[in-house]
Design a protein with these regions (language model features):
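A short, flexible N-terminal coil/short beta segment enriched in small residues
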Residues: 49, 84-86, 163, 168-190, ...
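Binuclear metal-ion centers of metallo-dependent hydrolases, dominated by the metallo-beta-lactamase
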Residues: 115-197, 315-376
Length: 423
């Protein structure tokens, strides 16, 4: 896709980092294993998958790596993967054992805490938002991640409508990936603590699964009284962008965010209250109600991450903190040090760094063979806005300036000045 896109725009071709044959060969290497059972992953390496409490199928991985010295015990490593919070729908919380040499832990919410909420509290919060959007008179758009978040929303909406807490508002699920994921959730619902038999907890007469592009486009004619759940969750791709284009300019419409919005994404910009955004190359004024519901997170917060780490100690040789924005990584590192760890053994690895791990001593940093793929200051920018955001803002500012200019000569003068800067 990127190759074709560059060709259409007259840009240089992109050298692929792998071929289709290589991708298909990699897929043939996939083997299904059961959780909570040790497997021989390679000579001298055992692995075990345990429930991470994040989404259906998410797992932490325990490794035991045999020492080259026969008298030395195997090194024990734990990779957290994404860790789920306590009290999450469809989950009993993260599982696993303790007593490791090294722990690698995620830090998505390493610097913040959320208010704990029960199932009843979560549904009450969703009910308030849906009723407020319904009263406003427009459609309710919910950008949602296709796996787990969408199914949680459907489950809660079905339950609220079944008990009469919400009117049976038409709900449209407009995400091909979410449709496929929902069938998987239905197949394995017994693993979610839901009854194996009976009606699907994700379906009802007023829940409509949108399967074709034509059906999705038809939703653009809706003006009120509907809930549209579509991906992507951060509004960076998918069908939600078309629904935003159709509804953001309507003051009676509502956009409800139910998940994390990375800095620089359209979702984050809308939450910040920008007056306009660019979608599909067009400026769209933001008049819709922008709301957020922070009760569906799939990630443990600071308090829960520290509890997860504490329950898996000791980590004799070190802890690596990964997968987070700079503030989250630094915040969680400080908190882990406060637990009594030597700061030198609580490591926030940088891109392209390589470490050698030893069962009897601390991890050793090996200098990368080549220069980092990012410029010195670029890593700090990865989690924030990039030039694409600046470009979109510049285009919007230029359009506003041209519209506010009274006469044609003044507009042409402004454009000439800009062109001189570019030369």
């Amino acid at each position: 896709m990127l190759f074709r896109s560059n060709a259409r725009r007259g840009r240089p071709p992109v050298d692929p980092i792998y071929t289709r044959d290589q991708a298909e060969a990699a897929l043939r290497q996939i083997a299904v294993v059961k959780r909570d059972r040790w497997i021989d992953a390679a000579p001298g390496i055992r692995a075990r998958y345990v429930d991470a409490g994040h989404i259906l199928g998410a797992a932490s991985i325990e490794l035991e790596v045999a020492s080259e010295e026969p008298e030395q015990p195997a090194a024990r490593l734990l990779f957290s993967g994404d860790i789920g919070p306590q009290g999450k729908a469809f989950s009993q919380g993260p599982q696993g054992s303790s007593n490791f040499d090294y722990i690698v832990v995620e830090a998505t919410y390493g610097d913040r805490e959320r208010q704990r909420v029960s199932e009843a509290g979560r549904r009450a919060a969703l009910k308030r938002e849906v009723l407020a959007a319904h009263k406003a008179g427009g459609s309710l758009l919910i950008p949602a991640f296709a796996v787990e978040r969408t199914q949680e929303l459907l489950h809660d909406l079905v339950a609220l409508m079944a008990e009469g807490a919400l009117p049976r508002i038409p709900v449209f699920l407009d995400s091909p990936l979410a449709l496929r994921a929902t069938t998987v959730f239905e197949k394995y619902r017994h693993r979610l603590g839901l009854p194996r038999q009976g009606d699907s907890p994700f379906r009802a007469p007023n829940i409509h699964f949108v399967e074709t592009v034509e059906q999705s486009k038809a939703l653009g004619r809706l003006r009120a009284g509907a809930i549209i759940i579509a991906g992507s969750g951060m509004c960076e791709a998918g069908r939600i962008r078309y629904h935003l284009e159709d509804n953001l300019w309507r003051p009676e419409a509502t956009v409800l965010f139910v998940g994390y919005q990375a800095p620089g994404t359209i979702g984050a910009l809308l939450k910040q209250g920008v007056p306009a955004i660019r979608i599909h190359g067009q400026e769209v004024t933001v008049r819709a109600r922008i709301r957020e519901l922070d009760v569906y997170s799939g990630h443990a917060d600071r308090r829960e991450l520290l509890a997860w780490i504490s329950a898996r100690l000791p980590a004799r040789r070190g802890i690596f903190i990964t997968h987070g924005e700079e503030s989250a990584l630094a915040g969680l590192r400080d908190d882990v040090v406060a637990l009594g760890f030597d700061r030198s053994r609580v490591i926030v690895p940088r891109l392209d760094q390589t470490f050698e791990l030893y069962p009897a001593t601390a991890a050793r940093l090996m200098k990368p063979a080549a220069a980092s793929r990012l410029e010195p200051k670029a890593e700090a920018l990865v989690a924030g806005k990039d030039w694409h955001n600046d470009y979109a803002a510049l285009v919007l500012d230029l359009q506003h300036k041209l519209r506010a200019t009274d006469d044609e000569p003044s507009r042409r003068k402004l454009l000439r000045r800009l062109r001189r800067v570019l030369q």
